[in-house]
């Protein structure tokens, strides 16, 4: 807010310390189908407290306490965190009552619209309240030049998003983000002979085994260093797990590149697949010279506390994978700090 951001997106996070209003699941026949959960995906159904998106405390804090003048945008109204507890009509009205200006991605647009319309007709919402948000949205469009240029020039997107300035900024941010949480074995930066045997064990919870580690390995091997890579995912067999463990036994160094990314509505949505977890646990038990790098979920050290060297890159973008490789090679200083605490292990700021 102090930096002048134009909008804030509020998530469906319950903070009972701020608003302890109790909510209960709707009967299943009244729910909209959530768009964030695959068929058969796990959905938590239990009594909870009101999510920030629909809490009047949200608007009070942003508008009154922080004096935020910009747009307040909801998280997607189609997410199961709302659809389990509220109809689309009620969710839309409550979000506006809480102070939101834009209602993002309803599961049923007509239902959300009609809910707001009926709330205005009944006097639950005033026309003034709707006009207030409409003015803010129109003002934001004007400030962004969308009044003069309503359509995005698709052909120019790559020149901006993938332009030199954007790439340089991404590289700078990535190199400042890399965090060496723990290095008990003093593995970073690498101090190995050029012909040292390095094994990269890439473990991914995505459907991307053919390419996920390419950016990291290509940057790490620049200069001729040979790296053997094996990738484990949800489809990997026990034979592949054993192959990875055997390869590690002859290695001078094993790098476990861990791609445990957030995947909404998926089983083990932030963790590692069973095959990868078994292989990693075996390497830890065998006391391999092991460097773990999380290209996603920073909390993996809590699941694998035996990792004596642990680096966090926070994501799998090319800029972050290249930055992690450069950090491992000692080409850049490692200056990142944990933005979160690892309970029982390391506090925020480590």
Question: Which functions belong to the PLM regions below?
Answer:
Residues 50, 55, 84-350:
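Preference for extracellular/luminal or secreted protein segments
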Residues 1-129:
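Second-shell residues forming the walls of enzyme active-site clefts
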